[in-house]
Design a protein with these regions (language model features):
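Conserved beta-strand segments that form the floor/walls of ligand-binding pockets within enzyme
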Residues: 1, 28-29, 42, 71, ...
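Acidic, metal-coordinating catalytic segment for phosphate/diphosphate chemistry
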Residues: 1-18
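Active-site donor-binding loop signature of nucleotide-sugar glycosyltransferases
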Residues: 4, 32, 45, 93, ...
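Short glycine/serine/threonine-biased micro-segments
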Residues: 4, 16, 37, 44, ...
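Well-ordered beta-strand scaffold positions
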Residues: 7, 25-26, 68
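Conserved Nudix-box catalytic region and its N-terminal flanking loop in Nudix hydrolases
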Residues: 22-64
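Unchanged
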Residues: 48-133, 137, 141-143, 156-168
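Short, highly charged C-terminal tails/helix-capping segments
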Residues: 146-153
Length: 168
């Protein structure tokens, strides 16, 4: 609270909106062209903008990062990443066409089958979680949204996240 004017400057968590978007049996992924984790593979996702719904933000990120038009299907997961003050929300989505292209934040975009996913080069633990939660529910019309595991220190990609955001 400002002593002079009484303004309260809230420092709240950031909301990240993303998609696991598919065309037939292939999953859309983007190789990051920006930090953090430049050169690693991720799902289309990014910070929400003012005056948009989470689903709108997720669809916008797919378009910005991979020039992809998606149809949102269902809420997949809500992942609390408290150590970096983020809530990451992913949806299942279907690509309206297989036409994708590199956006300004991506070095490459590709449609991967499950066995082709570059598991050793995933950018963040939430990408791993969302992919596995998608695989678990891809044939289900109804399911409860997932959350992060209680102990995610063994999740691939955790080491890089922990090194970048060490607790003080």
């Amino acid at each position: 609270i400002c002593d002079h004017c009484g303004l309260i400057n809230y420092e709240n968590p950031k909301i990240v909106a993303g998609v696991v978007a598919v065309w037939e049996d292939k999953i859309l992924m983007c190789k990051r062209a920006i930090e953090p984790r430049i050169g690693f593979w991720t799902l289309p996702a990014g910070f929400m903008e003012n005056r948009e719904t989470i689903a709108e933000g997720a669809a916008r990120e797919a378009h910005e990062e991979a020039c992809a038009d998606v149809e949102i299907d269902a809420l997949l997961g809500v992942y609390n990443v408290a150590r970096i003050s983020q809530v990451q929300i992913f949806y299942r989505a279907k690509l309206k066409s297989p036409d994708i292209a590199v956006g300004p934040e991506s070095a490459e975009v590709e449609l991967f089958s499950w066995d082709e996913i570059p598991w050793d080069s995933l950018a963040f633990p939430s990408v791993y979680w969302a992919l596995h939660h998608f695989q678990e529910t891809k044939d289900q019309a109804l399911f409860a949204p997932f959350s992060e595991p209680d102990d995610w220190s063994q999740t691939p990609g955790f080491e890089a996240l922990a090194a970048r955001y060490k607790d003080d």
